[in-house]
Amino acid sequence: MKVTDLKQLGQQAKEASYTLGLMDTRQKNTLLNKMAAAIEANAPRILQANALDLEQAATHGISETMQDRLRLTEERITAMAEGIRQVATLPDPIGEVDKMWRNEAGLLIGQQRVPLGVIGIIYESRPNVTTDAASLCFKSGNAVILRGGKEAFHSNQILVTILQEALIQEAVSPHLIQFVDDTSRETAQQLMRLNDYLDVLIPRGGANLIKTVLTTATVPVIETGTGNCHIYVDKDAQLTMATEIIVNAKCQRPSVCNAAETLLIHQEVAEAFLPTIEKALKEFHVELRADERALAIFEEAIPATEQDWETEFLDFILAVKVVDSLDEAIQHINRYNTKHSESIISDNYFATQQFLQQVDAAAVYANASTRFTDGFEFGFGAEIGISTQKLHARGPMGLAELTSTKYVIYGNGQARS
């Protein structure tokens, strides 16, 4: 795509964003429900486009796990529409006053929620990101420019087309939801430098994509990190509970960022627990990559490498390490994790509190699966991503995280002395 064409997308989105700022909550919710209905009504078009993407994925030898991230079904399309409807039911943050006070000069000062403006989103395989991002940006008063990966090109394109058609039918600018129809690296890099039109850029995808955006972009970036998530089984853990949590965190959907990638286990329960968890994971054909002590206990495992401790597998692979203490577990996590989601399984209150306080991550759990780090599960509705940085937003990013604030000041003739 030519730079001039990309700038035109940006200009159109910027101008359209001002019209969105004039809509009240009722109008936005009505339009969101229209979009949801359009997605459901056009399921055959979506499935047809998705079939093209799946065919190309198979031709290029993409793994079945990654194809699952790409695949759409009637049920998943319905879930996408329901996600849009849920966003319509959420409280609108725009116009909310976070705080208000009167200063010594008699000025009434309020801090009010406002849209960020135009949001650019660069993302990979999962087509549901398209509808999640579009609906969240729309409800929070932002225009959006979407640039998906080549794997889901046809799916993303038809989804945006359907959303734009729904807006056009209601005499609303389709430029509120823009689509970059060029998946080349050069166009992506141009988008990352579109400072005149983009207010923020949000990458969603693997480590390489996020690293590229962070090192290339001149537009401000909100980092949605990869998920090298850990579960630590303490010496005071309920082992039956631990088994259920680990199987859920690893096997329910291994291709997502909140799936567990490494299991740490206290040495005092390793011999009792590792055979049990090996048997449970074997039903899902999970490959175990273990340290020396775990290898001595497992029946079938391969030696873990240094790279395994820092890898987000997104597959039926689990790295396993036996640790001497809670302190060693925390040190390992803080060294190798991606600041996403970490969990301890323990009935020891003091061990649990130490873990929750000392582990550096967007979400830390006690006796629960890391799979709950999700906008829906947190009650935010659809999410734009899981932020693993500490500035602006951290954790699942819902509507409030897609806003900024401005100060609104009421006076009565005051002049500063």
Curated annotation (Swiss-Prot):
GO molecular function: glutamate-5-semialdehyde dehydrogenase activity; NADP binding
Gene3D superfamilies: Aldehyde Dehydrogenase, Chain A, domain 1, Aldehyde Dehydrogenase, Chain A, domain 2
A GO biological-process term: L-proline biosynthetic process
SUPFAM superfamilies: ALDH-like
Catalytic activity, EC: 1.2.1.41
Keywords: Amino-acid biosynthesis, Cytoplasm, NADP, Oxidoreductase, Proline biosynthesis
Gene Ontology CC: one annotated term: cytoplasm
Family: Belongs to the gamma-glutamyl phosphate reductase family.
Name the record gives this protein: Gamma-glutamyl phosphate reductase
